[in-house]
Structure formats: C-alpha cells, structure tokens
Design a protein with these regions (language model features):
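Non-transmembrane, solvent-exposed beta-strand/loop segments in proteins
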Residues: 1-241, 253-255
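Winged helix-turn-helix DNA-binding recognition segment
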Residues: 244
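Aromatic-anchored segments of alpha-helical transmembrane domains
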Residues: 247-253
Length: 255
C-alpha cells in the first residue's frame, strides 16, 4: 500500500522543504578517446542518494522488511520518482546508454540508485605538446528541471571513485577533481546547480617515441652523416638520395 497514492511525477518532499541529492561517479574505463572528433567515451556507474518522504514505513508492520528493490523505469509498475540528472556536455543523445536499474529503498525513506552505462562527453584536446601532452576533460552533470530552490545538489564524499578503474593502453588518469557550481541561465530566474567532474589525462608516449620519434631522428642523423662522405666520392650523392627517399617513405607511412 506504499504505492497506492504515490506519484512518480511529483517531488517526494514529505516533511522536507526540498530534495537533498548526493551524487557520485565511479569510473570503470575509458572506452574511446577520439582526439579528432573531440570526444571521450567512458564506462561509469552514476550514483545517487536521496530521501523520499513518501516511502517511509514501519518494518514491524511489514514482516520486518527494512529495504526493497524498486523499479525506476518511467511509466513502469510501482515506479518511483528519480532525479533527472543529465550530462550537460554530452556528445550524443543525453544519457541514452545509462540503464534504469532498480533502486534500493530503505524503511526510513533513504534511497540508493546506481546507474551503470556508457556516456560520451565533449572534450577539447590541445595537441601542441604531442606526444607528451596532458589533457583536461570535464563531465558536467545536473538536473534539467529542478533549480536550487527545489533540489539541493551536493557532492558525495569521495564523489569520484576509481577503485575499479581499468587503465587505458594509451592514457593514464593522472588526476581528478569535482566542483559544485550554481549557474543562472537566460531562460529562467533561478539558479541551477551542476557538478563538474574534471579528469586529467596523461598520454603514454612510449609507442610514439619508439615508432615515430626514434626512427625519424635516426633517419635525419643519417642525412648528417652523408656530409662526412668525401665530396669526390660517387657514393655521397646516392647515399644522400637513399636517406632522403627513406625519410619520405617513412613520412608517407605515418600519414
């Protein structure tokens, strides 16, 4: 009977003035880092914690049941209200590949909801120091509907979890940070909170050093050595031409 008069379309305030939503992200892996397209695809678990004032019960009245798993799919049977958190800087349809997993509801009304899935964000890559470059990619999350007078968006302690992160072959996650922002948009008079997660990526240059830089330097050095060959030797010109052709072929392969 908890869901008899329950509406998943209304803020479940109960005795609260506004919903306090804690957020966190567990990074599992970076599936794709596309520097040409300017996108970063990540496998994540998007975590939410809040209190639903309309889902509180006395366990003694329900066979000592203290928690239950409930549906979060919009329009589903016994579906509960869930926060509409979107990735603002998405590179595709917002949150399309995040699963509407079941949420854990406790008898005191507190809810834990973890959404596994794939997100694709935009990222501006600065390749001036390639291949010894460091990139900074943001993930900006926030509610699409609720402003700061309706939802108190907060950072969970340890909001970024990388304990189960699978390292990328070409990149290293060097650092990460999170920041809570309040932004006033031209459409609306209220402030809208968002949480921006900043990920710092360091390129692993070993492959490029071994396969590009070292051969290029070696070939260029041979060109200098050609000047040590006696000028009246017929092999000097043929040696220089051979080195030049080798360098051209190498550059064609790289392109």
């Amino acid at each position: 009977d908890l869901f008899q008069n329950y509406s998943a379309d209304c803020l479940p305030l109960g005795d609260q003035d506004l919903i306090t939503l804690k957020m966190g992200v567990a990074f599992r892996a970076f599936n794709s880092i596309d520097q040409v397209e300017g996108t970063l695809t990540a496998n994540i678990w998007l975590r939410h914690w809040w209190r639903d004032g309309n889902l509180i019960w006395n366990p003694e009245d329900y066979n000592n049941i203290t928690e239950m798993a409930v549906n979060t799919e919009p329009g589903g049977d016994s579906s509960i209200w869930v926060p509409d958190i979107y990735l603002y800087n998405t590179a595709e349809k917002p949150m399309e590949q995040l699963d509407y997993s079941r949420a854990h509801v406790y008898s005191d009304g507190y809810i834990i909801w973890s959404r596994p899935g794939i997100i694709k964000s935009t990222c501006t890559f600065n390749l001036r120091s390639f291949p010894y470059d460091t990139q900074h990619c943001p993930f900006k999350f926030g509610s699409w509907v609720y402003h700061d007078g309706q939802m108190n968006l907060t950072l969970d302690e340890g909001s970024i979890d990388v304990s189960n992160f699978q390292e990328n072959d070409g990149w290293n996650m060097a650092d990460f940070s999170s920041k809570l922002n309040f932004v006033k948009y031209t459409c609306c008079p209220e402030l809208y909170p968002d949480i921006t997660l900043n990920v710092t990526l360091e390129r692993l240059p070993g492959y490029y050093t071994l396969n590009i830089i070292t051969p290029a330097y070696a070939t260029s050095s041979l060109m200098i050595i050609s000047f040590l060959v006696p000028w009246d030797s017929g092999e000097r010109i043929s040696f220089a031409i051979t080195v030049m052709l080798s360098l051209i072929v190498f550059l064609l392969i790289l392109s």
